[in-house]
């Protein structure tokens, strides 16, 4: 079988695609993949690092206000469709999967016009503009949140979950927290604000330093590389808590997750897939800067099952964050209950489910 994958712009669209490729390759080594992205996007560097064949098209997103740039976007889209058709005719895939981001628009649309079976994978509870557009052309729409159903034709929707869940569950031997000087016998809280960090989360962690010092749990705190020096200097002024280790970035984060008891993070789709697959209780601080506030909608879908605590960024303080951490890490019964409820929402076989949908549309 030959499969084309397209998705880009953010890690939330790219990493599920890579997790899917990895799982399918593990189960079926003879399957061939081609990844279509943009030349300047994050996906090019990440995908090529994984030694996956990569082709590029030029595309940009629509402005939400009336703008001459939208005329250019339409022209790029049409050119992107033609370029995609040439790649597809050359590669001759059995199916095409779009995982979101502007780049998959021309690719999946071109595939549908060439009568190639197509799937879009929507990671969020509130779909992006590209997937909404593509829904009318594809064979199936794979979703990760029940809330997304309402935005797509019901006969096309299938719940698969996010393949990133399969990837974290498949890690047998995780990395040890000892390399950071942390005690493996203590409850450990991981705090991070996404790949670049988040200033409001950093501010709250700095504020809670004094209260943190007396706690019997420990923190692994990831500032984001751009914030690291500034945050470290402020922490030193406050007096560093001995039960917190501060790092700018955590490479291969999934390798450490099985050693983590509680997470404080943004509510991106990839993070949610990981914590639910592993059953890690999480305090979500959704980013208010994303389209249609979809991160808060993602987080609330877990909160309503008592599987997460949600703190709005606008209400975030050091005291509130420390209280929320105490509520879970300082209460064994609550931690175990939330872990169980979180895991019940996980889809550890998401990659296999998506592959089964793909097989279904290529054999009918």
UniProtKB/Swiss-Prot annotation:
Cellular compartments annotated: Cell membrane
Catalytic reaction list: di-trans,octa-cis-undecaprenyl diphospho-N-acetyl-alpha-D-muramoyl-L-alanyl-D-glutamyl-meso-2,6-diaminopimeloyl-D-alanyl-D-alanine + UDP-N-acetyl-alpha-D-glucosamine = di-trans,octa-cis-undecaprenyl diphospho-[N-acetyl-alpha-D-glucosaminyl-(1->4)]-N-acetyl-alpha-D-muramoyl-L-alanyl-D-glutamyl-meso-2,6-diaminopimeloyl-D-alanyl-D-alanine + UDP + H(+)
EC number(s) per entry: 2.4.1.227
Topological type in the membrane: Peripheral membrane protein
Binding site for UDP-N-acetyl-alpha-D-glucosamine: 10-12, 124, 195, 295
A molecular function (GO) term: undecaprenyldiphospho-muramoylpentapeptide beta-N-acetylglucosaminyltransferase activity
Pathway(s) served: Cell wall biogenesis; peptidoglycan biosynthesis
GO annotation terms (biological process): carbohydrate metabolic process; cell division; cell wall organization; lipid glycosylation; peptidoglycan biosynthetic process; regulation of cell shape
InterPro entries hit by this protein: GlcNAc_MurG (IPR006009), Glyco_trans_28_C (IPR007235), GlycoTrans_28_N (IPR004276)
Pfam family, one: Glyco_tran_28_C
Enzyme class: transferase
Superkingdom as given in the UniProt entry: Bacteria
Keywords: Cell cycle, Cell division, Cell membrane, Cell shape, Cell wall biogenesis/degradation, Glycosyltransferase, Membrane, Peptidoglycan synthesis, Transferase
Gene Ontology CC: plasma membrane
HAMAP family (alphabetical): MurG
The family this protein is said to belong to: Belongs to the glycosyltransferase 28 family. MurG subfamily.
Protein task: Cell wall formation. Catalyzes the transfer of a GlcNAc subunit on undecaprenyl-pyrophosphoryl-MurNAc-pentapeptide (lipid intermediate I) to form undecaprenyl-pyrophosphoryl-MurNAc-(pentapeptide)GlcNAc (lipid intermediate II).
PANTHER family: GLYCOSYLTRANSFERASE, UDP-N-ACETYLGLUCOSAMINE--N-ACETYLMURAMYL-(PENTAPEPTIDE) PYROPHOSPHORYL-UNDECAPRENOL N-ACETYLGLUCOSAMINE TRANSFERASE 1
Protein name per the record: UDP-N-acetylglucosamine--N-acetylmuramyl-(pentapeptide) pyrophosphoryl-undecaprenol N-acetylglucosamine transferase
Organism for this UniProt entry: Bacillus pumilus (strain SAFR-032)
């Amino acid at each position: 079988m030959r499969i084309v994958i397209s998705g880009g712009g953010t890690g939330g669209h790219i990493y599920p695609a890579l997790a899917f490729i990895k799982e399918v390759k593990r189960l079926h080594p003879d399957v061939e993949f081609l990844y279509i992205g943009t030349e300047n996007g994050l996906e090019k560097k990440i995908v090529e690092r994984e030694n996956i064949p990569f082709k590029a098209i030029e595309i940009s997103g629509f402005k939400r206000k009336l703008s001459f740039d939208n005329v250019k976007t339409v022209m790029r889209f049409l050119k992107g469709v033609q370029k995609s058709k040439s790649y597809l005719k050359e590669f001759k895939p059995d199916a095409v999967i779009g995982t979101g981001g502007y780049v998959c628009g021309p690719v999946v649309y071109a595939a549908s016009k060439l009568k190639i079976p197509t799937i879009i994978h929507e990671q969020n509870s509130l779909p992006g503009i590209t997937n909404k557009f593509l829904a009318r052309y594809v064979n199936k729409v794979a979703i990760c949140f029940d809330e997304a159903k309402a935005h797509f034709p019901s006969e096309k929707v299938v719940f698969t979950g996010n393949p990133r869940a399969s990837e974290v569950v498949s890690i047998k031997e995780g990395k040890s927290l000892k390399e950071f000087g942390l005690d493996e016998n203590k409850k450990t809280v991981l705090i991070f604000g996404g790949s670049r960090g988040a200033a409001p989360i950093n501010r709250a962690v700095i504020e809670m330093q004094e209260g943190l010092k007396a706690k019997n749990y420990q923190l692994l705190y990831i500032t984001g590389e751009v914030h690291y020096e500034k945050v470290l200097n402020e922490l030193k002024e406050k007096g560093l808590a001995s039960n917190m280790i501060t790092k700018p970035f955590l490479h291969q984060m999934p390798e450490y997750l099985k050693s983590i008891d509680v997470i404080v993070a943004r509510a991106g789709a990839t993070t949610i897939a990981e914590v639910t697959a592993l059953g890690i209780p999480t305090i979500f601080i959704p980013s208010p800067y994303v389209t249609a506030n979809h991160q808060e909608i993602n987080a609330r879908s877990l909160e309503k099952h008592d599987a997460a605590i949600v703190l709005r960024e606008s209400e975030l303080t050091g005291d509130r964050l420390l209280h929320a951490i105490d509520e879970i890490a300082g209460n064994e019964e609550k931690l175990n209950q939330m872990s169980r409820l979180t895991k019940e929402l996980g889809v550890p076989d998401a990659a296999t489910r998506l592959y089964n949908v793909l097989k279904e549309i290529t054999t009918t």
